[in-house]
């Protein structure tokens, strides 16, 4: 632990060189954080929410619509491919976003390429505008990639 901020920065800078549009991911900067007389390297980004918009995580979206946890529902589905299909189908059904499957493909490709092992239903989301219309959210939270947590599995 401790390198997540740097990883966010590096991954976002590498995504600048990809075929993704700038609005498809969050661009991070490094930030020095002083805490209890120690300095830590963190990160920050511009607020990607337009005025009056909200970030709705998939867990919150599903719970708000079905009054049931998405996590609990997913664990009743044995196959990973069926879980992904369920996530895409339900998100498109609830939000009306028609290309959520393509969005999920981008997230999973980024996570695979950068070895991000911390993708979950609280860091995948959609945006809701002031008129309660849903939009794709920029991809964020790639900080567990690039072996940033290697010391947890292999203490040095």
Model-assigned labels for residue ranges:
Residues 1-70:
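Conserved ATP-binding subdomain of kinase catalytic cores across diverse folds
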Residues 47-108:
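ATP-dependent phospho-/nucleotidyl transfer catalytic cores
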Residues 148-156:
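Primarily interfacial, aromatic-capped hydrophobic alpha-helices that serve as membrane anchors
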């Amino acid at each position: 632990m401790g390198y997540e901020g740097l990883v966010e920065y590096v991954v976002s800078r590498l995504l600048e060189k990809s075929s993704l549009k700038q609005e498809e991911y969050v661009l991070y900067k490094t930030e020095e954080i002083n805490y209890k007389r120690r300095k830590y390297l963190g990160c920050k980004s511009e607020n990607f929410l337009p005025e009056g918009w909200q970030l709705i995580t998939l867990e919150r979206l599903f719970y708000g619509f079905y009054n049931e946890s998405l996590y609990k529902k997913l664990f009743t589905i044995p196959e990973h491919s069926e879980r992904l299909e369920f996530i895409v189908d339900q998100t498109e059904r609830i939000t009306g976003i028609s290309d959520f499957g393509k969005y999920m493909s981008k997230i999973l490709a980024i996570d695979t390429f950068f070895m991000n092992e911390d993708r979950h239903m609280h860091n995948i989301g959609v945006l809701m505008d002031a008129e309660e219309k849903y939009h794709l959210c920029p991809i964020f939270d790639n900080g567990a990639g690039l072996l940033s947590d290697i010391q947890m599995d292999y203490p040095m």
